[in-house]
Every structure is written in C-alpha cells, then in structure tokens.
A protein has these predicted regions:
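Cyclophilin-like peptidyl-prolyl cis-trans isomerases
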Residues: 1-199
Length: 199
C-alpha cells in the first residue's frame, strides 16, 4: 500500500520530553494515529528532537518544535536521502482506520470531532505547510488550549491537523515556555516495542 515504507506505532508509547522549563510526559496514541505516532516515536528514538528550539504560532495557540538545524525543514531519511513525509492522518469516530490526506472540510464533516480531538492543553499535533496536507515531516506542536479562546468544536486544528497524543504530566510547564526554550532531550520510556519500521 501507499504508506508501507513509513514507520508505524501499533499501540501506545510514553515519551519523556525534557525541556529548559521542566519535564513533560506524553502518551502517543498509535491506535488512532499509527503513522503520525510512528514518525514521532521513530524520531524520538533517533534523538532527532534533542537540542531543538521552540517556535510559536500565535494564531493557533500552539508551541511548535522539530525544525532541524540547517536548510532542511524536516527529517532527511538516511536511506533515501529525501525528506520523509507523513500524510495527514485523522480517525473519524465509527471508522476502523484513519482517513489520509483529507481534511474534515474536504469530507464535508463540519460538525464532527475526530477520535483524537484538540481538546486539552498539551494535545500533540503534527504540523504541515499551508500548501499541502502530506508534507509534514518532523515538526510538531503542543496545543495550548484555552477554553475562553477556543469555543467547543470551533478550534481551527481539529480535522485539519493530526493529533497523535497528549501530555499527561507537566502541562503546567507548557504555560511557561517561550521561543527561548529548547527540548533538551526526548526519550521513549515505554512502548518502544510497538514501533515498527514499516508495514
């Protein structure tokens, strides 16, 4: 199939992210986002995120990281020498497998909430460019949910970006972070056996 060469997470994994503001623990949900979760856990295991800075995109209330040093904007796969891209991956409630490279708008789902919604502080999302849905490679963001700024069901990222996990410890650290902060290290503390390098 089309995405067989991509890593996948068949289950859950727990990742500890040490930052210059403090430590976060995140659970990555490969049941609902196998390719996105797989790409993230694979990059964590490669040490890709260690030392990378944060950038902030105010309009979405997110704190973003994963842009490598140098000219590349994503992860260059040493095997192919190309930037590895992950398709937009969203699981619609009631479906058994995710839909790829279609926003909820494309699907006409204007009121639907994905199985993994951007509904809490510290939801992990996968970034892609404005130009394409399938060019996300390594950049991810923490959703900085604020109820008064994000009326239920009206945030702009549900159905447009893949959520792939949640911060379960350290969400107060997120509130303190700025663009001056960095990821010191990220490591998988459980569930690494659920990572498969391809289909």
């Amino acid at each position: 199939a089309e995405f067989d060469a991509l890593p996948r997470l068949l289950g859950r994994a727990t990742v500890e992210i040490r930052t210059s503001q403090g430590d976060l623990t995140a659970v990555i949900d490969g049941y609902s986002a196998p390719l996105t979760g797989g790409a993230f856990v694979d990059l964590v295991e490669r040490g890709f995120y260690d030392g990378l800075p944060f950038s902030r995109a105010e309009d979405f209330y997110v704190l973003q990281s994963g842009n490598p040093k140098g000219n590349a904007e994503g992860f260059i796969d040493p095997k192919t020498k190309q930037e590895r891209h992950v398709p937009l991956e969203i699981l619609v409630p009631g479906d058994t497998s995710p839909i790829y490279n279609m926003t909820f708008e494309d699907l006409g789902l204007f009121k639907a909430t994905p199985v993994l919604p951007f509904a809490t502080l510290g939801t992990l999302g996968w970034a892609h460019s404005d130009k394409a849905l399938d060019d996300g490679s390594s950049q991810f963001f923490f959703f900085l949910y604020e109820a008064e700024l994000t009326p239920a069901g009206l945030n702009l990222v549900d159905g447009r970006n893949a959520a792939f996990g949640y911060v379960v410890e350290g969400s107060e650290v997120l509130k303190e972070m700025t663009m001056d902060d960095t990821i010191i290290s990220a490591k998988v503390i459980s569930g690494s056996e659920n990572l498969k390098s391809h289909a």
